[in-house]
């Protein structure tokens, strides 16, 4: 007889191979057709569920998504999906950052047109088309990754509602006195011809000239060495930007530092330097024959002493200023100070101006294109700042003022878009004054939860130490600075009335209205200049920093949302901002400043940051290096779920590594998890939980142990989700599937499932546990492997009695009954013994003592507690160890020499070939094979089952 037909072997249509690249889009279509996102919101609204809002940090609408986007969006999606399943009305409105230099730069580059030959409105129209194109491309990619959200009603910073709400933020900050226009040294990109903020700066290695320059003494308040002619006295500065020498107006010293005269014995010259820095500086200048002369002096003694500019033709007095920015890191302690080309330089001068000690025009002999102006001198005029370096050094040498020169490799600021080096340049710009609300901003940082916790100090220190925020840009594609200029008196005008008028028009027409209408049509009717009563005005041409755009989205999406988001989006402050760690100086930063300035609080309750994606060796990904792993390539080859599983597996709070090898390894892990689901499904084909379930108290002890482990894993996973520690969830699920289930529980269970009568208590007990495990596990992993979880859910029995999608379901509830401590302790001991037996069997198979484990007969030697554990399970010991026969001995010394021993030697296992006849149905070797004449070649257990089956 062919007994295989009498076995209850697994049956399922759930395939072994995921075929994810082809199958996942079908689930995307299912979710879209059934409006999954809105159905979830409607369900939670009916339940009166608490709200959870993750505000999306908008990616820039420029180019295809990269693996960093995939990491970011998937982390957000895991959280949103989990929060819904945990009982929240979890909304997610995806957004896009659409204004600014990168898009304008790309449009001009693609079109090949000169900005000067294009009207502002024409350029803006092309920028809008460009942004819309990339939004659709990125949106398609995000949806394909499994991201769920209100994509039909996404937010974009070019939306008139958001533009109007941004103008409202600006207006409120202006009303409070936080907005001003002034001349300051700001980052300037001469290629893009605009000011830049710190967040728009990238630092790259650059080789620069490093020079030491002499400034002749003029009026040094009697501080020179006694008896030395003043013509021999010089202050020495150090700089890596020789092109700024024409703009030098001051020398800064630290008032607390000690300064000395250094006598260069060979040249018979005296140099003013900091005492600690002098030896290194002199070594750079190759001066070996020197001595200190005169007394030691503090920097404070030198305040407002006078030197001369090193170029005699300038005939410029250079004053000494006190500056706490002067450090002992490098140089001479006498710092070259050009207010037109340095933030610290400008601030130290302004302090003196504000105190009435000095009043001079700030010199900035560089134009918008980064070329030297006539103010620098005819020998430099027209040259770029970089071209001016060589002639500047030559001129210093010609004048005899170049003391030393070498090259220096250092990190230098570059433009984030065009990648060219930037300069500091003093220009008229619009600023947000941070000092006025800095303390409130720091309190808001303290009130925020940071994950990881070090994010607090990073953002706190940035806010504490930052300068005023330059919010104006000299470009066209963006939200205008809503300021007017009176043609009569020249004053700028920003009032609550003008802001309200502009905001109303922008809400209807968008910010194109700023360039499409004359000022009179944008201002309130019959508006008069508050300064002179004039009635003719023109608009500001500058636009706002894109970080002001994205930093104001809380106002238009969270606090006062568009009607389409009213029911789901409004939540201010929101629960969470989640972005890369670079956003401490970017979106987290700008959002905090605008929100605190207007409302006195942060726009978020918590901030979560992730690291950057590196290659498998920890290097930055680069097209030129060829180590880029694109999300589209992973999805096309392996499927989005494999990528999502990888993202859940890494500790994203630091930098994470990715390579083809890592993805391949993750696909193997995915396959193991998938096969666990497949096996569970395959053994539930004839199980109806309503009629076939076994009460917990009547279940087999092994099945109750499996539920115990399920409960422990469930609690670990749910806590991991709550703590945003997805790698903890990943490892718990992976271990549960591969060890607890595949290697232990399901392995032991096979005999029961396949050979027992279909409706026997033994089989139904196993199926009851498996059904509970399957329906719980599929929900636990649904936020991560969202496509596979849906596929499993659709394959479950009794589909009509559940939610139509796993993503409409709740997370499994905790069940205290499963946490049986006594059972846990008992099975820890049993499994420890089984582990020893398993290793012994593996060794015996390698030595070819046995083939299949059911060909084995084992004897376990133990004493004490181990012996008690073995005796308590003597009847089921063979089944537990997956062998045909198992014996117990309480005499360790009786074990043969070749017996396998545990590491501590307290358990030994001998293995022999079992010579009993093999049951042709269950393959066990037992003494009762052929005991039933009706059923030859089968054991008594199988014969009984066959009789019950009517065979």
Roles of regions detected by a PLM:
Residues 2-20, 26, 30-34, 108-246, ...:
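Residue patterns forming the tRNA-binding/recognition surfaces of aminoacyl-tRNA synthetases
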Residues 43-106, 157, 237-244, 319-348, ...:
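N-terminal catalytic cores of NTP/NDP-binding nucleotidyl/phosphoryl-transfer enzymes
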Residues 46, 50-57, 67-71, 75, ...:
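Secondary-structure capping and boundary motifs in well-ordered enzyme cores
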Residues 97, 190, 197-202, 537, ...:
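Acidic, turn-prone loop/beta-hairpin segments
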Residues 186, 412, 483, 526, ...:
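Residues immediately within or flanking Cys/His clusters that coordinate Zn2+
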Residues 189, 415, 486, 529-532, ...:
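Short cysteine-rich clusters marking metal-coordination/redox-active sites
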Residues 193, 474, 490, 533, ...:
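Cys/His-coordinated zinc-binding microdomains
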Residues 250, 257-334, 343-347:
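Protease-associated
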């Amino acid at each position: 007889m062919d007994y295989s037909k009498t076995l209850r072997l697994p049956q399922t249509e759930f395939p072994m191979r995921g075929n994810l690249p082809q199958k996942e889009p079908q689930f995307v279509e299912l979710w879209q057709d059934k409006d999954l996102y809105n159905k979830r919101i409607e369900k939670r609204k009916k339940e009166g569920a608490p709200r959870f809002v993750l505000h999306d940090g908008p990616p820039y609408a420029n180019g295809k998504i990269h693996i960093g986007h995939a990491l970011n969006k998937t982390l957000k999606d895991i959280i949103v999906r989990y929060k819904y399943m945990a009982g929240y009305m979890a909304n997610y409105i995806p957004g896009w950052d659409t204004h600014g230099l990168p898009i304008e730069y790309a449009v001009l580059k693609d079109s090949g047109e000169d900005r000067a030959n294009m009207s502002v409105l024409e350029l803006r129209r092309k920028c809008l088309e460009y942004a819309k194109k990339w939004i659709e491309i990125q949106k398609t990619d995000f949806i394909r990754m499994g991201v769920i959200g209100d994509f039909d009603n996404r937010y974009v910073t070019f939306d008139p509602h958001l533009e109007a709400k941004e103008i409202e933020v600006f207006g409120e900050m202006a009303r409070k006195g936080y907005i001003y226009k002034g001349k300051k040294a700001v980052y300037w990109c001469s290629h893009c011809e605009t000011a830049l903020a710190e967040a728009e700066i990238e630092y790259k290695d650059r080789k620069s000239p490093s020079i030491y320059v002499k400034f002749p003494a003029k009026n040094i308040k009697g501080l020179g060495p006694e008896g030395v002619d003043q013509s021999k006295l010089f202050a020495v500065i150090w700089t890596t930007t020789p092109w700024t020498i024409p703009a030098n107006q001051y020398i800064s010293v630290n008032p607390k530092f000690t300064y000395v005269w250094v006598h260069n014995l060979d040249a018979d010259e005296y140099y003013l330097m900091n005492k600690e820095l002098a030896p290194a500086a002199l070594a750079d200048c190759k001066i070996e024959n020197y001595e200190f002369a005169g007394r030691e002096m503090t920097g404070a003694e030198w305040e407002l002493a006078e030197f001369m500019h090193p170029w005699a033709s300038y005939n410029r007095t250079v004053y000494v200023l006190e500056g706490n920015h002067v450090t002992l890191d490098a140089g001479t302690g006498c710092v070259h100070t050009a207010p037109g080309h340095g933030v610290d330089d400008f601030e130290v001068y302004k302090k003196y101006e504000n105190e009435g000690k000095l009043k001079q025009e700030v010199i900035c002999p560089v134009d918008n294109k980064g070329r030297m102006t006539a103010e620098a001198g005819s020998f430099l005029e027209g040259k770029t700042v970089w071209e001016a370096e060589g002639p500047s050094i030559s001129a210093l040498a010609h004048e005899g003022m170049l003391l030393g020169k070498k090259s220096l490799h250092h990190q230098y600021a570059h433009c984030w878009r065009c990648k060219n080096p930037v300069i500091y340049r003093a220009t008229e710009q619009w600023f947000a004054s941070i000092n006025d609300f800095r303390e409130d901003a720091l309190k808001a940082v303290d009130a925020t939860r940071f994950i990881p916790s070090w994010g607090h100090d990073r953002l706190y220190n940035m806010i504490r130490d930052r300068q005023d925020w330059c919010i104006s840009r000299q470009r066209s594609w963006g939200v205008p600075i809503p300021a007017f200029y009176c043609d009569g008196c020249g004053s700028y005008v920003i009032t609550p009335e003008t802001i309200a008028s502009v905001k109303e028009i922008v809400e209807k027409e968008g910010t194109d209205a700023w360039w499409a209408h004359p000022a009179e049509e944008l201002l309130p009717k019959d508006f008069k200049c508050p300064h002179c009563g004039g009635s003719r005005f023109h608009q500001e041409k500058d636009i706002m920093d894109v970080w002001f755009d994205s930093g104001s989205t809380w106002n238009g999406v969270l606090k006062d949302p568009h009607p389409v988001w009213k029911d789901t989006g409004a939540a201010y402050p929101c629960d969470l901002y989640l972005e890369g760690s670079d956003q401490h100086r970017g979106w987290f930063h700008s959002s905090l400043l605008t929100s605190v300035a207007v409302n006195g609080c942060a726009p978020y309750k918590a901030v979560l940051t992730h690291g950057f994606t590196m290659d498998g060796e920890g290097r930055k990904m680069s097209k030129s290096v060829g180590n880029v792993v694109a999300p589209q390539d992973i999805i096309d080859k392996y499927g989005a779920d494999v990528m999502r599983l990888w993202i859940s597996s890494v500790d994203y709070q630091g930098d994470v590594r990715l390579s083809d090898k890592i993805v391949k390894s993750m696909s193997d892990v995915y396959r193991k998890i998938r096969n666990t689901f497949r096996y569970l499904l395959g053994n539930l084909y004839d199980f109806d939980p309503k009629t076939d379930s076994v009460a917990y108290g009547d279940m087999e002890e092994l099945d109750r142990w499996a539920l115990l482990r399920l409960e422990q894993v469930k609690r670990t996973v749910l806590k991991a989700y709550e703590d945003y520690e997805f790698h903890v969830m990943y490892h718990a699920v992976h271990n549960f599937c591969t060890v607890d289930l595949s290697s232990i529980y399901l392995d032991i269970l096979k005999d029961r499932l396949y050979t027992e009568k279909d409706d026997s208590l033994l089989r139904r007990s196993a199926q009851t546990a498996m059904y509970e495990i399957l329906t719980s596990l599929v929900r636990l992993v649904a936020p991560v492997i969202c496509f596979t979880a849906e596929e499993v859910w659709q394959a479950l029995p009794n589909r009509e009695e559940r939610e139509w999608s796993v993503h409409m379901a709740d997370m499994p509830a905790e069940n205290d009954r499963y946490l049986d401590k006594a059972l846990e302790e008992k099975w820890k001991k049993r499994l420890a013994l089984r582990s020893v037996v398993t290793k012994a069997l593996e060794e015996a198979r390698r030595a070819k003592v046995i083939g299949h484990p059911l060909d084995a007969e084992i004897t376990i030697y133990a004493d004490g507690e181990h012996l008690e554990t073995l005796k308590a399970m003597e009847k089921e010991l063979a089944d537990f160890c997956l062998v045909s026969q198992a014996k117990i001995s309480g005499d360790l010394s009786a074990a043969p020499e070749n017996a396998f021993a545990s590491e501590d030697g307290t358990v030994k296992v001998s293995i022999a070939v079992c010579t009993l006849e093999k049951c042709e149905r269950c393959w066990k070797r037992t003494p009762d094979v052929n005991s039933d004449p009706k059923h030859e070649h089968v054991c008594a257990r199988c014969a009984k089952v066959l009789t019950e089956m009517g065979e």
